[in-house]
Amino acid sequence: MQYVMGRTNSMTRGFLNKRRVLEKCRTAKQKIHYCISRYFHYLPPVLAILLPIGSWPFLSEQQWWYGSFLFPVVSSLGWLFAIGRRERQLRAAAGQLLEAKIRKLTEQDEGLKNIRETIEKRQKETDRLKLHNDKLVEQLGQAREVFIQAKGRYDHMEELSRRLKEENQQLQIQLEAAVRERNEKILENQELLQELKETLAYQQELHDEYQATFVEQHSMLDKRQAYIGNLEAKVQDLMCELRNLLQLEMGAKTNLPGKPVASRDVVAQLVLEFRKIVFRVETTEAADSLTALRYTRTDPSAHNYSLACRQLFDGLREENLGMLFIYAPFAQRVLFANALFNDWTGYGLEDFLNRESDVVLEGFAQWERDLLTESRVERSGKIVIKTKAFGATPFYYCVVTLDKGPFAQHILGVLYPAKASFFTNLSYI
């Protein structure tokens, strides 16, 4: 049915288009014939005007004459004006003559008058019907175009509906497959969840058993480590007391340097040996060997610091490089000074830091400035000390601010005799 309707519409459109083309061709031919028959008598004067104008570019200056050009132009214009005016007169006269003859004929014959009136009425009716027919033809063309557009839209909508229907079917199939897959995944997830719950319950039981065992063993380990820690602390205290007793027994027998050093190499060797002591002091840490203190829950920082200081002081007492000391500049307090201060000079380190004691005879300003400086760079110099046994004696000194270790930000220093004769005089005492 749709095919037959489409075929009929296409034939109708073809017929109407053909009829419209033929009507346009006939109208164009009538217009061309009317123009030629009406304006043919104007052709000669127009040629008379165009001929001199068209030949003007091809004439030389000697052949051209203004009068000969102007005369044809003016005469042609006059001819055209006269012909046009005469034509209008003749046309008006012919119209008046024709009307007069028709009026005379119709006035003389009543039948012709009636026929004329009838013809005029029919002519008016014909004109009206022709206008109405033209309007109907135009409306028919518009309706045909609207119908064609509607038919195209209908075909497009029908094709779109067909495609949407196919896509809907495909989406429905995909949706059913997705729902099926989702149901399978839900069943699988439920099974996995059940297995996971059982596994978690079993692991929780194992965790509870392991936790109880761990707490019990940890409690036993804490008791054993506390007992071991107490024993090690007692051993360390006994070792420190034994070392102190041995040092007190050997108090008067302080080890002196074996061989005096040449004066030009004293400072270099003093700094070299002093750097070794500085490295050992900065790398001294708390007593990490106390395994009991590692595992117990008590804070070992205070015990470790005091033990480290005791061990460090014991090590510095055994050094025979020179008069070693540790000084806190921010508190202006001496923390450590070995026994060589009293053995060599007869004074304590506090006397070296007091300007009014007159122990430092020369270089006190530089000595005090180096002690109060916070720079990490080694500072060395020379001062003259008033000793009780030998009087004024020059000493080299080297000081540095410790960067780390138990005594960070403290001053570590050493003093050494500048003359080798000092040890010779000391051996006679």
From Swiss-Prot:
This is UPF0242 protein CT_616. InterPro entries: UPF0242_N, UPF0242_PAS. Belongs to the UPF0242 family. The lineage of its organism: Bacteria, Pseudomonadati, Chlamydiota, Chlamydiia, Chlamydiales. Pfam families: PAS_12 (PF18095), UPF0242 (PF06785).
